[in-house]
């Protein structure tokens, strides 16, 4: 209706059904197939709306994904290790203060450091328990910046295949995946874009050159 009535110059639409479905059901299954068919129908409805509005021939369409997904078998909670080594202070089950804290981004996590005097000690601890924490990569702030990630953190860790990181600071370091939070669900994201299936980028319209295949892109 918006397209037909207002004929906007620019319209940005986020179809989140596939993302939600993969978080809850995994990468490839009947539910994912249903979500893909729903997305296909909605895209068809949008294209048809431009035809009904008489703007189809003047409209450029860009269809893209913002990330892929990887499966999650277990959730790893590095804050349990940090707490046991005095980096996190807890009272009555709540964090009262911390020298360092791991904040989950799914398959990666950002490490916020309040006490820079312990930064070297923290790095050594993570290196020592790298295998137990299922860490594949430890990036410094500068290395993360070179990859296009900025933020109020000192390090970023990325997990091995099949795990995501959690925020829990008590209990077991290793827990089962949990669909109550998308970061810890049976499939999630937060990994380097070189892993897994890469999101699509499809463009067509009067200002788009046809028949061109772009192997990869970089937004930096």
Regions found by a protein language model. Name each.
Residues 14, 20-24, 67, 182-183, ...:
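Histidine-centered active-site/metal-ligand motif
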Residues 19-23, 70-73, 78-79, 165-167:
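Short catalytic/ligand-binding loop motif for oxyanion handling, primarily in non-cytosolic enzymes
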Residues 2-11, 18-61, 121-128:
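A long, amphipathic alpha-helix that forms part
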Residues 58, 65-114:
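Acidic/histidine-rich catalytic neighborhood
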Residues 26-30, 76-81, 171-174:
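Short secondary-structure boundary/capping segments
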Residues 38-82, 156, 201:
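Metal-dependent active-site segment of extracytoplasmic phospho-/sulfohydrolases and closely related
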Residues 97-220:
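Active-site neighborhoods of enzymes that stabilize oxyanions during catalysis
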Residues 13-17, 65, 159-162:
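Short, well-ordered beta-to-alpha junction loops that form the rim of enzyme active sites
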């Amino acid at each position: 209706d918006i397209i037909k009535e207002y004929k906007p110059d620019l319209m940005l639409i986020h179809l989140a059904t596939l993302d939600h479905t993969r978080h809850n059901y995994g990468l490839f299954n009947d539910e994912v197939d249903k979500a893909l068919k729903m997305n296909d129908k909605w895209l068809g409805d949008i294209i048809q709306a431009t035809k009904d509005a008489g703007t189809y021939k003047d409209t450029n369409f860009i269809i893209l994904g913002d990330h892929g997904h990887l499966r999650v078998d277990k959730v790893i909670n590095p804050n349990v290790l940090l707490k046991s080594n005095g980096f996190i202070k807890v009272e009555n089950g709540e964090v009262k203060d911390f020298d360092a804290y791991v904040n989950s981004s799914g398959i990666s996590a950002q490490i916020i450091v309040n006490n820079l005097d312990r930064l070297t000690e923290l790095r050594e601890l993570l290196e020592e328990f790298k295998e137990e924490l299922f860490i594949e990569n430890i990036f410094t702030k500068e290395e993360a910046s070179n990859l296009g990630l900025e933020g109020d953190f000192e390090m970023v860790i990325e997990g091995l295949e099949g795990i995501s990181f959690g925020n829990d600071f008590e209990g077991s370091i290793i827990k089962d995946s949990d669909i109550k939070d998308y970061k810890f669900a049976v499939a999630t994201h937060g990994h380097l874009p070189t892993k897994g299936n890469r999101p699509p980028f499809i463009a067509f319209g009067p200002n788009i050159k046809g028949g061109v295949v772009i192997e990869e892109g970089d937004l930096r």
